[in-house]
Amino acid sequence: MRKPFIAGNWKMYKTPVEAAGFVRELIDSLKDVSGVDVAVCPPFPALWPVKEALEGSNIALGAQNMHFEKEGAFTGEVSPAMLQDIGVKYVILGHSERRAYFGETDELINQKIKAAFTWGLNPIFCVGETLEERERGITKAVVEIQVLKGLAGVTAEQAENLTIAYEPVWAIGTGKTATPDDAQEVCQFIRELLVKLFGREIADKVRIQYGGSVKPENIKELIAKPDIDGALVGGASLKVESFTAIVKGSI
């Protein structure tokens, strides 16, 4: 059985002071929760204060992006070595907002995924189709290209520590959600791709999250599906009450 995994993607919200205060409330709210892995992914400036606030808790630290090089003349970038040094465990890579607004390609995302593994970070690798692609009936073709290109050169041993987040782009921040059956269909397809890449044993260990307007009201239906192992939560991760409800609803 794969352990549920709920990760909060805070995007560009919360100052370092706000983030530390929020996390202290969240720790208290989740202190008696077990049977689920939980991570929060604050903006870069908040990583250190959040890391300090999380000490001794049952919540892991994640980042929202990284460069693939250890160091260098890359103004404005943050390296995997820096994230590892802070104590980051997870890193979101390939999010649709990075692809759309910052021109990230499948090839660049692949470099980042391999670098994350090299530095002992666990990628949360995001894939998903746009509304236009869904309406054209090419969801699986789009997701297949993203998965195969994104995971090129990744070993089966590394893939054991991989999380994939299926996030239909048209559902992110819109209030629209793929139906649980639609989400399951794509997540099952992703798992079958992983079987081809790494074999059944490894594919069955990889956790596949759903992302895209996840709320306390829909988490139970989503998590009940056999190939959905958790959620990458956006807006609802910014409030203690809603994020706690999603975490508890996943168990």
Curated annotation (Swiss-Prot):
<comment type="function">
    <text>Involved in the gluconeogenesis. Catalyzes stereospecifically the conversion of dihydroxyacetone phosphate (DHAP) to D-glyceraldehyde-3-phosphate (G3P).</text>
</comment>
<feature type="binding site">
    <location>
        <position position="213"/>
    </location>
    <ligand>
        <name>substrate</name>
    </ligand>
</feature>
<keyword id="KW-0963">Cytoplasm</keyword>
<comment type="subunit">
    <text>Homodimer.</text>
</comment>
<feature type="binding site">
    <location>
        <begin position="234"/>
        <end position="235"/>
    </location>
    <ligand>
        <name>substrate</name>
    </ligand>
</feature>
<feature type="binding site">
    <location>
        <position position="173"/>
    </location>
    <ligand>
        <name>substrate</name>
    </ligand>
</feature>
<dbReference type="InterPro" id="IPR000652">
    <property type="entry name" value="Triosephosphate_isomerase"/>
</dbReference>
<keyword id="KW-0413">Isomerase</keyword>
<dbReference type="GO" id="GO:0006094">
    <property type="term" value="P:gluconeogenesis"/>
</dbReference>
<dbReference type="GO" id="GO:0046166">
    <property type="term" value="P:glyceraldehyde-3-phosphate biosynthetic process"/>
</dbReference>
<dbReference type="InterPro" id="IPR022896">
    <property type="entry name" value="TrioseP_Isoase_bac/euk"/>
</dbReference>
<dbReference type="InterPro" id="IPR035990">
    <property type="entry name" value="TIM_sf"/>
</dbReference>
<feature type="active site" description="Proton acceptor">
    <location>
        <position position="167"/>
    </location>
</feature>
<dbReference type="GO" id="GO:0005829">
    <property type="term" value="C:cytosol"/>
</dbReference>
<dbReference type="Pfam" id="PF00121">
    <property type="entry name" value="TIM"/>
</dbReference>
<dbReference type="InterPro" id="IPR020861">
    <property type="entry name" value="Triosephosphate_isomerase_AS"/>
</dbReference>
<dbReference type="InterPro" id="IPR013785">
    <property type="entry name" value="Aldolase_TIM"/>
</dbReference>
<dbReference type="GO" id="GO:0006096">
    <property type="term" value="P:glycolytic process"/>
</dbReference>
<dbReference type="GO" id="GO:0004807">
    <property type="term" value="F:triose-phosphate isomerase activity"/>
</dbReference>
<comment type="pathway">
    <text>Carbohydrate degradation; glycolysis; D-glyceraldehyde 3-phosphate from glycerone phosphate: step 1/1.</text>
</comment>
<feature type="active site" description="Electrophile">
    <location>
        <position position="95"/>
    </location>
</feature>
<dbReference type="GO" id="GO:0019563">
    <property type="term" value="P:glycerol catabolic process"/>
</dbReference>
<protein>
    <recommendedName>
        <fullName>Triosephosphate isomerase</fullName>
        <ecNumber>5.3.1.1</ecNumber>
    </recommendedName>
</protein>
<comment type="pathway">
    <text>Carbohydrate biosynthesis; gluconeogenesis.</text>
</comment>
<keyword id="KW-0312">Gluconeogenesis</keyword>
<keyword id="KW-0324">Glycolysis</keyword>
<feature type="binding site">
    <location>
        <begin position="9"/>
        <end position="11"/>
    </location>
    <ligand>
        <name>substrate</name>
    </ligand>
</feature>
<comment type="similarity">
    <text>Belongs to the triosephosphate isomerase family.</text>
</comment>
